[in-house]
């Protein structure tokens, strides 16, 4: 299988409708791949907090999903939209990831469960999601998490329990903590023997420089592809059996206990 990372810049002075058109053109002109992943909230701009209320959309037929579904159909390609500001009623918004199949239909959605509060308004403006799921694809059983979710092992244990073999991670991870990004994407791949496909944003949004370094990490922790810090689309080939072969050769997950109880010494 061939997987592409679309490391997109979202400058705050670029209108979302222009960015959607620009990115759709980039994807249509990109080399062939079976699956492409975009960053977190690339269309509205993650750091465009003052505009969130005006940039919410439907995950069924909103402008971002509609534009990416058209690309998916034209290229017969799976597209992970990254995430959009989903309107969920009553003026509420969620940070929702969307996976689109080659027929343009939605195959999986996930609303980010760990909204970020440190020097960010995400936790003030967005409602956290409450559920996560996985779906079967030609690439294996697939789940998605978003950005800050990387820091929470319990969520990753859950997607492992759901049978995930591939984890897609859209992000808007700042350059200041890009070392953590690289460490955590590798760690999650190794500890759960997953193929981790992680797409960060690029460029600057206001005063914040985004870290880039989108990457694909196999279950051994080998980095199959890593981008730099600028906007680009790049792809690599990944063996179809990389997860199954790793788990068969080194069956760590077979030794995982069903529970790890905390014991208190009462003596």
Language-model features, listed with the residues they occupy:
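Short beta-strand scaffold segments in enzyme catalytic cores
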Residues: 81-83, 96-99, 133, 214-216, ...
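CN hydrolase (nitrilase-like) catalytic-core segments centered on the catalytic cysteine
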Residues: 60-78, 150-234
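A short C-terminal boundary segment appended to hydrolase-like catalytic domains
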Residues: 244-267
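Extreme N-terminal starter segment of soluble prokaryotic enzymes
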Residues: 1-5
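Active-site catalytic loop in hydrolytic enzyme cores
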Residues: 88-162, 175-177, 183, 245-252
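Short beta->alpha transition motifs characteristic of CBS
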Residues: 49, 98, 109-116, 215, ...
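Cys-nucleophile CN-hydrolase/nitrilase-fold catalytic domain and related Cys-dependent amidase chemistry
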Residues: 13-103, 109, 174-194
């Amino acid at each position: 299988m061939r997987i592409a990372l679309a490391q997109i810049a979202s400058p705050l002075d670029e209108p979302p409708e222009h960015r959607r058109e620009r990115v759709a053109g980039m994807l249509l002109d990109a080399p062939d791949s079976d699956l492409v992943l975009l960053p977190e909230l690339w269309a509205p701009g993650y750091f465009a907090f003052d505009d969130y209320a005006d940039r919410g959309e439907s995950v069924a037929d909103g402008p971002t999903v509609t534009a990416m579904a058209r690309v998916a159909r034209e290229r017969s390609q799976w597209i992970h939209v990254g995430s959009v500001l989903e309107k969920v009623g009553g003026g509420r918004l969620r940070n929702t990831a969307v996976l689109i199949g080659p027929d343009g239909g939605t195959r999986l959605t996930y609303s980010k469960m760990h909204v970020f509060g440190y020097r960010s308004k995400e936790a003030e403006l967005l409602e956290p999601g409450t559920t996560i799921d996985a779906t079967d694809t030609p690439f294996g059983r697939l789940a998605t998490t978003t950005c800050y979710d990387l820091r929470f092992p319990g969520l990753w244990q859950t997607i492992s329990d759901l049978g995930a073999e591939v984890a897609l991670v859209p992000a808007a991870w700042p350059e200041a903590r890009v070392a953590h990004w690289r460490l955590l994407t590798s760690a999650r791949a190794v500890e759960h023997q997953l193929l981790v496909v992680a797409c960060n944003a690029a460029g600057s949004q206001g005063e914040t420089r985004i870290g880039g370094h989108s990457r694909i990490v196999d279950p051994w922790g080998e980095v199959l592809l890593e981008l730099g810090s600028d906007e680009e689309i790049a792809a690599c080939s990944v063996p179809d059996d990389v997860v199954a072969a790793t788990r068969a050769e080194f069956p760590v997950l077979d030794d995982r206990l069903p529970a790890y109880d905390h014991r208190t010494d009462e003596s």
